[in-house]
Amino acid sequence: MSNKTAWWKKSVVYQVYPKSFCDSNGDGIGDLNGIRKKIPYLAKLGVDVLWLNPIYASPQVDNGYDISNYREIEPTFGTMEDFENLLAEAHEAGLKIILDLVVNHTSDQHPWFQESRKSKDNPYSDYYIWKDEVINNWGSSFGGSTWEYAEERAQYYLHCFAKEQPDLNWENPKVRQEVYDILRFWLDKGIDGFRMDVISLLSKDQSFPDGPVIQNKAYGSYYAGCANGPRVHEFLQEMNREVLSKYDIMTVGETPHTNADEAALYTDESRKELNMVFHFDHMHLDYDENGKYATNRVPLVALKKVMTQWQDKMHECNGWNSLYWCNHDQARAVTRFGNDSEEYREISAKMLGTCLHMMQGTPYIYEGEELGMTNADFTKLEEYKDVEALDIFKD
């Protein structure tokens, strides 16, 4: 199918964070049957695609982004039958469903890692990235070093996120084939595509260079050796050739530390990688030494410049934009980009919605964004059920 007529170019995507969306059984946690209950609402809202955050089996250290079994549903959310019913009912209502694909890392409880950590000579020994010593200054996104010692193997493994999320070794062709089999499993069930978590980090610079130390941090940034690495486009082209191109689906990659020129390489139709990417240029405009937890206002002129740059570049390179103001990793749009006071909340939400939907690209709406939801008013640390926030606080 040509990109000029691709269905995802005419779609609006609604992001569902299952835990907090709708609870069907009264246990205080959202679930798949809760999402099913809301299909009439979502269809009436006028969205076209539902993006579900991870629903796979997981210890939930990072709210499902630590996957222990890619072919099972997290019991908290329901069963595979529940998912299949949700998919069928969504399709019947004219809604498509895409799933979160998390394959930069797994849970440390995944059978691959449980085997890999046992020894240096078992079939899974090089499914992950192991070193005899801490070889660089990289710091994890969630605080501390990216290197964790495993006594059983007497080596260190790499984890760009929590220590319970070891990074997969994409240099190993067996790992890539395992991932492609997982893709086929879900695509053969009839899902309509994937949002690919931190997909720009798959290929590590095999020299593992030290990263720059900024803002008085204790560690260097791992992005210097991970983001947009030397083989990432090769890997994605292989994935597209072997799996993605065989289905009528949409793909969007989360690509931290990727500028518009680099994004063109991921999204140019002729390169056969991804349909679009999530960039972070507009997300970083209010950063200071506290990063995403800064309380600065977003500078309007700088925001306009960034959005214009991405509009122009994606049009120029025959790529496609993903348009978003917020998601599960970011502050609420009205609070961050508008004014969440009683006087201005509604008009701020309408202004942001108008801006989002009038640009070229596929709009993404985070659950509640259509209502003008604002940041949660948490006053106690224990109210935060987020490993990143808690680890950064401790760090």
Name what the model sees in each region.
Residues 1-395:
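Active-site and adjacent substrate-binding regions of carbohydrate-active enzymes
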